[in-house]
Amino acid sequence: MGIVGVGIDLVSIPDFAEQVDQPGTAFAATFTPGERRDASDKSSSAARHLAARWAAKEAVIKAWSGSRFAQRPVLPEDIHRDIEVVTDMWGRPRVRLTGEIAKHLADVTIHVSLTHEGDTAAAVAILETS
């Protein structure tokens, strides 16, 4: 069938860094233990690393929402926690889904690209069916 959704998101790293570890913010319970561990293992700023992952999660949600054009969005509560950005041994990102979103996107391949430039992190997600 081909591409069914495309999403992109940009994140201000300084703004994100101010909020990421604050109790009660949207970011407090958003990242998996693996994502937080990977961020703390990086030589650069953990906030910079997590900002790109937040952008990836948002890009996946936007791609999924776009794939449901003219249909009611079905966004589970705590959806960000069910979208995990993992990397292979060479640092290439991949999205791992769990929970309700994994059921909805079971037959979809998700391609994701992350980048940082200056004070901005960005991600693009493409949803593809075979």
From Swiss-Prot:
Q: What is the gene called? A: acpS
Q: A GO CC term?
A: cytoplasm
Please spell out the taxonomic lineage of the organism that makes this protein.
Bacteria, Bacillati, Actinomycetota, Actinomycetes, Mycobacteriales
Q: Where in the cell is it found?
A: Cytoplasm
The signal peptide, as residue positions, is none
Q: Which Gene3D superfamilies match?
A: 4'-phosphopantetheinyl transferase domain
> What keywords appear on the UniProt entry?
Cytoplasm, Fatty acid biosynthesis, Fatty acid metabolism, Lipid biosynthesis, Lipid metabolism, Magnesium, Metal-binding, Transferase
Name of protein: Holo-[acyl-carrier-protein] synthase
**Chief localization class?**
cytoplasm
Say what the protein does.
Answer: Transfers the 4'-phosphopantetheine moiety from coenzyme A to a Ser of acyl-carrier-protein.
